[in-house]
């Protein structure tokens, strides 16, 4: 097979909230158009009576990703939540063509989103650009497996199949899940546990704290405990179901912690 250059179309930028449950798949923000990573190494450079001393210092890595906005997209929402709340986010640059080990070459880092820009022209889609500053430096490695809809997204989210190989719709056309129903809660003096019915087709659930809808956790179960609340305090909790198609509309419940026990 003749050697070919790495094509930009094959390189995908994946993200994951630091609150995502262990074992969760990475998120591929929709409609990516451009991406880049860059690194700069500081050099120790001094002149001495014995001549010039030159040596390597620390490395500062950064990244930029541009994409068109999509309502309800889970990957884009994870980025926005990390930016709004000043949280770290996990970040991968992945070559989606398998290497000689039958795996995917990748770079990984924890990062902060330094800037986010919306371009809202009269014509065309809304363009969103983000810049990231990596904590430490990017780590090189290999990803064992990736969801088919990420690998084959440029082909419509799927590759050739044999008759009867799978069931369901094309991976790239997964409909949004329904909103969680029948939210209930139990309370202590400093926490509330919210429960809801399972949503068909949901891979996980985002739980948001307060009126500002700050992401508290991404969970794969149908309950979550929110802690660190003052006694006798109301707290609005929103829950949304998530799958490969994006995030569902939110369902809301107003909770209240128990009063503090009297010490008199």
Swiss-Prot record:
Highest taxon in the source lineage: Viruses
PTM notes: The tail tube is formed by the proteins gp17.1 and gp17.1* at a ratio of about 3:1.
UniProt GO cellular component terms: virus tail, tube
Summary of the function given for this chain in its UniProt record: Forms the 160 nm long, sixfold helical, rigid tail tube. Binding to the entry receptor triggers structural rearrangements of the tail tube leading to ejection of the phage DNA into the host.
InterPro entries: FN3_dom, FN3_sf, Ig-like_fold, Phgtail_TP901_1
UniProt domain Fibronectin type-III: residue ranges: 179-261
Listed name of the protein: Tail tube protein gp17.1*
Keywords for the protein's UniProt record, in alphabetical order: Viral genome ejection through host cell envelope, Viral long flexible tail ejection system, Viral penetration into host cytoplasm, Viral tail protein, Viral tail tube protein, Virion, Virus entry into host cell
Annotated NCBIfam families: phgtail_TP901_1
Gene Ontology terms: biological process: symbiont genome ejection through host cell envelope, long flexible tail mechanism; viral head-tail joining; viral translational frameshifting
Organism: Bacillus phage SPP1
Localization, UniProt: Virion
Assembly with partners or alone: Homohexamer. Self-assembles into a long sixfold helical tube. SPP1 virion tails are composed of about 40 stacked rings, and each tail ring is rotated by about 21 degrees relative to the previous one. Interacts with the tail completion protein gp17.
């Amino acid at each position: 097979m003749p050697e070919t250059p790495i094509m930009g179309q094959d390189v995908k930028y994946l993200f994951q909230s630091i609150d995502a449950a262990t074992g969760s798949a990475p998120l591929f923000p929709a409609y990516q158009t451009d991406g880049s990573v860059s690194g700069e190494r500081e050099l120790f450079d001094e002149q001495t009576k014995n001549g010039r001393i030159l040596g390597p210092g620390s490395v500062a890595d950064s990244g930029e990703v541009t994409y068109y906005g999509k309502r309800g997209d889970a990957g884009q929402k994870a980025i926005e939540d990390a930016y709004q709340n000043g949280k770290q986010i996990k970040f991968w640059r992945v070559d989606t063509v398998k290497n000689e080990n039958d795996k995917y070459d990748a770079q990984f880092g924890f990062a902060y989103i330094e800037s986010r820009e919306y371009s809202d022209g009269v014509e065309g889609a809304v363009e969103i650009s983000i810049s990231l500053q990596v904590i430490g430096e990017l780590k090189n490695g290999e990803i064992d497996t990736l969801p088919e809809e990420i690998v084959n997204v440029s082909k419509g989210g799927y590759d050739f199949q044999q008759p009867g190989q799978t069931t369901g719709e094309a991976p790239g056309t997964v409909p949004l899940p329904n909103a969680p129903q029948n939210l209930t809660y139990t309370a202590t003096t400093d926490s509330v546990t919210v429960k809801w019915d399972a949503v068909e087709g949901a891979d996980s659930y985002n739980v948001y704290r307060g009126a500002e809808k700050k992401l508290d956790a991404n969970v794969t179960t149908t309950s979550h405990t929110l802690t660190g609340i003052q006694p006798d305090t109301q707290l609005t909790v929103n829950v949304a179901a998530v799958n490969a198609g994006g995030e569902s509309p939110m369902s809301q419940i107003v909770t209240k912690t128990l009063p503090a026990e009297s010490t008199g």
